[in-house]
Structure formats: structure tokens, C-alpha cells
Amino acid sequence: MYAPIIKLSEIKNFLSSNSLVAQKKFGQNFLIDQNIVRYIAECSKDFFEKENVELAEIGIGLGTLTYPILEFERPTYLFEIDRAYIELAKTTYLNLFPKAVLYEGDALENLHHIFSKEVFIFGNLPYHLTSEILTIIATEFKNWRGGVFMVQKEFAERVTGEISSLSIFLEGMGKIEFLKKVNKKCFYPVPKIDSALIRILPRPKEERLFHSKEDIAVWSRLLRTFFWGKRKQIQVSLRDSPFSQDPKFQEAVRKAWEKTNISPTSRPEELNRKQFLTLGQELLDLLS
């Protein structure tokens, strides 16, 4: 089954007849390539189809991806802020799927409803909220089973390939994979840059770096300290960063890099992901 508004002509007609324009502040660029829609569904189903896992979608828009998600006939939690698309969902397809629950308003204020759910998440994420949403998922969702997200291609390359504060932070929770570049012409209105699909799968609980709010705070503090001066030696950042001005924390970090054979003259970009995770685990052990 396809969404009621899927062709480019249908989208333009819907927007025009309702005196609507795509809202840049909400990151509204509507996916119009059905090959990509099918790809998202196909590359995700193995992670929830055989188990009792629920689904969620952040930003349903015109329902292009929502329809195939709802056809899995799982309890599904939908998040949408724009009144026009909330009303579209209510008047066209929500009544066909009794297992769907729609949360109206800002997703950042509503995601708490599913923090404890065993859920697989989909989302076409606005650029200005991408990091915040992924951080919330990494730190607040206790039982989530993974997610596939549409993000800007530059962000996808950075979070999957580069050594950055966010990529290493998320690595402590799960595995991040670059799935597919999505050409900007697959959207309407056509954005200025290409997008990409990433998949994040959480590590088994026993392998996750952080297990409590306190762990998260320590891990975040370590990364903020080191990446405060990305091209500085980590010993310099530890000494000078505003995030590390605590003798107990500084001493624990020094002991941690000694035990993990990481040189204090290293720069963050010279360390690999495994070294960061090993260092983080040692630091958490020392401070526990």
C-alpha cells in the first residue's frame, strides 16, 4: 500500500490546495523516490520482523514511509509537529491502522513516551536537530533495537567515518553504519545537498560503555575535554579545558591513559575508536 500523496504532482497539488509550503524550520523535504522507501523498509525488517519489537517514526510528513511501516502491523508510535500533516494522517490513513499512536507536537518533548519501549526507530531528521535526537536515543532509550535515519550526507560521513566527539560518543552505545547515499533529486523541494541513510544498532547491554546517568556524564566530559582542542595534545586539553577543571577527574584520566598505553602527547584525531572506548571504560572503572 502506498501513501495517498506520493507522486510529485500530488504533492504539489496538496500543498497548493491547502495554501502550504514546505517548512524549512521543520526540515521538510519530502521523499518522492519509492525505490528509497522500499530500500528503507527492506534493510530494516530483519532487525524486528521475527521478534516482538515495536516501531516508531520521527516526522511522518506526508506519510510516504509511514504507510510501509504501518503495514508491518506492529504497535507503531508516530511523531509529527506540523498541524497540516497531523490532520492529513488523521483524515486519510490512521483509522486504517488501529495499532498506530500519533504524538502531536515537538518530538523532543514527546519521545519520553517511548523511552522504555522495545522499539525500532525511523526518521528523516532535520539537520539542526540530528545530533540532539540521536543523543537522546543513545542516552534515554533503554530497550531500543536500532534505527534507520535519513540525514545530510556530510553528517553521515562525519559520524561514520571521522573521529569526532559525537561519533565517539555514539560508538559507546552502538554501531553506526553508512548505508546509502540519497541524491537530493529524490526529494521535493530539492534541497541544496545530498542526503544519506545511516543505521544504528545498539550494542548488547553488557557491551555498552555507559549504563547510568553518571556513566554518561563521565563519558561526555572526557570527550568534551579532548575535543575542546581537537588538534591539541590530550595532556594539554586535560590541563586547560574548562570541562576538566577537577583534580580527581584529571588524575583519573592520567591513570586511564597510562593503563591503556595511550600517549598523553596524542591528539584526539590520532586515536581510533577502539582506543577511545578502551580509555573510556578504564576511566569509568577508576571513577566507579
Q: What does each of the following model-derived ranges do?
A:
Residues 1-221, 225, 269, 278-281, ...:
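Catalytic cores of RNA-modifying enzymes
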Residues 55-65, 230, 257-258, 263-266, ...:
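Extended, compositionally biased low-complexity polar/Lys-Gly-rich tracts
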Residues 190, 213-262:
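Long, well-ordered amphipathic alpha-helical subdomains in the mid-to-C-terminal portions
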Residues 246-288:
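Conserved Class I S-adenosyl-L-methionine
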